[in-house]
Amino acid sequence: MAENEPQVQFKLVLVGDGGTGKTTFVKRHLTGEFEKKYVATLGVEVHPLVFHTNRGAIKYNVWDTAGQEKFGGLRDGYYIQAQCAIIMFDVTSRVTYKNVPNWHRDLVRVCENIPIVLCGNKVDIKDRKVKAKSIVFHRKKNLQYYDISAKSNYNFEKPFLWLARKLIGDPNLEFVEMPALAPPEIAMDPTLAAQYEHDLKVASETALPDEDDDL
């Protein structure tokens, strides 16, 4: 096992409101779920997620909070030495998007210039409340954004690929094979996916609103 261990490893912190699907998302990667370790002192699970790229294997040690965010903020020990992050919200819950700036503020207070991906989860659910046109925080803060659906595996690899390109410094980096993922629990409607991709493209070409607040 040891000789196959990827040389390139990154600490990735997964943050966002409770119930947005962070644990569901990280558990999709089967070997990471099988090999996860619980860090009792911080109350976190660390999932080792390996991806095979055209530049060799890389491993994200993904820190998942095990639900403590429901009791307020996370301790600095969770963020310290993080090299990248995913902030997650639930597109069916406006309040989880409204809280994104708080998560971002806590993160950058401890980790100044790390690459961050914002993910809107549960896009498989028809009753979407947070539409593409209202998702602007990432544009103001220079983050990447993806719609995802953890339960259907839709766009699962996208945040990891974007982060890998930033961390390795190679915009042409590609995944040469996909990790084994848990079978989809639901199917993402391809028509809906195409519509959302179109909506995001249109939104990205629209001027940002003028107001100065965080949303």
UniProtKB/Swiss-Prot annotation:
Switch-II: annotated span: 67-83
UniProt note on tissues of expression: Ubiquitous, with the highest expression in ovary, muscle, eye and brain.
UniProt cofactor note: Mg(2+) interacts primarily with the phosphate groups of the bound guanine nucleotide.
Membrane-spanning ranges: none
Gene Ontology molecular function, alphabetical: GTP binding; GTPase activity; magnesium ion binding
Pfam families in alphabetical order: Ras (PF00071)
InterPro entries recorded: P-loop_NTPase, Ran_GTPase, Small_GTP-bd, Small_GTPase
GO cellular component terms, semicolon-separated: cytoplasm; cytosol; nuclear envelope; nucleus
Cofactors that this protein relies on: Mg(2+)
Subunit structure, interactors included: Monomer. Interacts with rangap1, which promotes ran-mediated GTP hydrolysis. Interacts with kpnb1. Interaction with kpnb1 inhibits rangap1-mediated stimulation of GTPase activity. Interacts with rcc1 which promotes the exchange of ran-bound GDP by GTP. Interaction with kpnb1 inhibits rcc1-mediated exchange of ran-bound GDP by GTP. Interacts (GTP-bound form) with tnpo1; the interaction is direct. Interacts (GTP-bound form) with tnpo3; the interaction is direct. Interacts with kpnb1 and with tnpo1; both inhibit ran GTPase activity.
Name recorded for this polypeptide: GTP-binding nuclear protein Ran
Phylogenetic classification of the source organism: Eukaryota, Metazoa, Chordata, Craniata, Vertebrata
